[in-house]
Amino acid sequence: MAKLTKKQKALQGKVESTKLYAFADAVALVKDAATAKFDESIDVAVQLGVDAKKSDQVVRGAVVLPHGTGKVARVAVFAQGAKAEEAKAAGADVVGMDDLAARVKAGDMPFDVVIAAPDAMRVVGTLGQILGPRGLMPNPKVGTVTPDVATAVKNAKAGQVQYRVDKAGIIHATIGRRSFDNEKLQGNLAALIDALNKSKPASSKGLYLRKVAVSSTMGVGVRVDTQTISA
């Protein structure tokens, strides 16, 4: 773990671990603690009231953030024929079938998102052991296995983030960069929270959104009052 700077230690001392901060105040604290020379990402962790060990309570999906993430995704598409042309026209960085699979097997993967037309899954299915551990395996639940490859590419380029609850019942996502103003960060977080609410499992009982905290790539985490999140 990287050592905290004097500034980060001072700010960490100002953050009350049990206090719920208004979103604007939480972001201000996080930005003050972000001392890296690069434009750090602003990340969020959302504790959900689910038992992730139960298959019917696994929360997974994708949402296009209204203000993007501050990073343009590199997109690969497995498709052929007309679908391949649609993907290229939509801005896909790499498009192919067996040739693209060969590149993946060789370790040549210059992309952040993988999308597949349904008929391409016969090829993509052989790449599970490579793409899966990297979080790149296409899945219909997050819209990356779809006949509408053009829309999927546009969504990925527009700042779509995928989310999946971990074993502890927590969702981790990036909602922007330190350079974003508070309104954009708040709008992005509101969109994510809305998507999570819509993904609530029917079997989830009690309080669903339990805790929300924001942090920068290398900074401290600050808990947020969910009542102050709405855009």
From Swiss-Prot:
Q: Which GO terms describe its molecular function?
A: rRNA binding; structural constituent of ribosome; tRNA binding
Keyword Ion transport attached: no
Q: Which GO terms describe its cellular component?
A: cytosolic large ribosomal subunit
Name any one Pfam family assigned in the record: Ribosomal_L1
Instruction: Print the keywords alphabetically.
Output: Repressor, Ribonucleoprotein, Ribosomal protein, RNA-binding, rRNA-binding, Translation regulation, tRNA-binding
A Gene Ontology biological process noted in the UniProt record is: regulation of translation
* SUPFAM superfamilies linked to this entry: Ribosomal protein L1 (SSF56808)
Q: Which domain of life is it from?
A: Bacteria
**Cross-referenced InterPro entries, in alphabetical order?**
Ribosom_uL1_bac-type, Ribosomal_uL1, Ribosomal_uL1-like, Ribosomal_uL1/biogenesis, Ribosomal_uL1_3-a/b-sand, Ribosomal_uL1_CS
What NCBIfam families does the record point to? Answer: rplA_bact (TIGR01169)
Stated role: Binds directly to 23S rRNA. The L1 stalk is quite mobile in the ribosome, and is involved in E site tRNA release.
Family annotation (PANTHER family): 54S RIBOSOMAL PROTEIN L1, MITOCHONDRIAL, LARGE RIBOSOMAL SUBUNIT PROTEIN UL1M
Q: Tell me which family the UniProt entry assigns to this protein.
A: Belongs to the universal ribosomal protein uL1 family.
Under the subunit heading, UniProt states: Part of the 50S ribosomal subunit.
Q: What is this protein called?
A: Large ribosomal subunit protein uL1
